[in-house]
């Protein structure tokens, strides 16, 4: 079975590579919208992304993985900013506050349609406006929910975190691996002489 990551995110691609499996990447054409709750939003959007790619390539034996992330502050969903000014506004709101990051991951194949959702609480330090301006101008976080990437300079914004770090990055790696492992889609293959002590990973 071939694995396809339905995402344009370089961060999700990098995290998938840590699983040691072969996979392809295809960007889904899905309009993002906020639903009644953050859980429902990431659940539905991750599923739409995976289904879009699956339907496009439905003649193939594939497993498609889609993911979506939102940030929630005081009950309000923050998605990706549409401008640098909006990004600065989001970070000003997050400054010194707790917020919750929700990430959904969908798995779609001819026999599977499952979604897992993970949430993590994050508290930011008080951020000087000059630091916010520096970050937004240098990193231009228009592709990131909440206008920040915890894996880049914005890591210094974080005062406390409660939950899974990779949920905040946008791909809860441990949960993804556990799902694939329990379904029998991730397993060690036999070692080869040219592995130099390592192990290959195969999908069942």
Swiss-Prot record:
EC number: 3.6.1.9
Site (Important for substrate specificity) location in chain: 11, 69, 151
One Pfam family matching this protein: Maf
Catalytic activity: dTTP + H2O = dTMP + diphosphate + H(+); UTP + H2O = UMP + diphosphate + H(+)
GO molecular function: dTTP diphosphatase activity; UTP diphosphatase activity
Function: Nucleoside triphosphate pyrophosphatase that hydrolyzes dTTP and UTP. May have a dual role in cell division arrest and in preventing the incorporation of modified nucleotides into cellular nucleic acids.
Family affiliation: Belongs to the Maf family. YhdE subfamily.
Identification of the protein by name: dTTP/UTP pyrophosphatase
GO term, biological process aspect, one: nucleotide metabolic process
Native source organism of the sequence: Thermotoga petrophila (strain ATCC BAA-488 / DSM 13995 / JCM 10881 / RKU-1)
Keyword vocabulary terms for this entry: Cytoplasm, Hydrolase, Nucleotide metabolism
Classification via CDD domains: Maf (cd00555)
Location(s), subcellular: Cytoplasm
Protein origin, superkingdom: Bacteria
GO cellular component: cytoplasm
Cofactor: a divalent metal cation
Catalytic machinery residues: 68 (proton acceptor)
EC top class named in words: hydrolase
Nucleus listed as a keyword: no
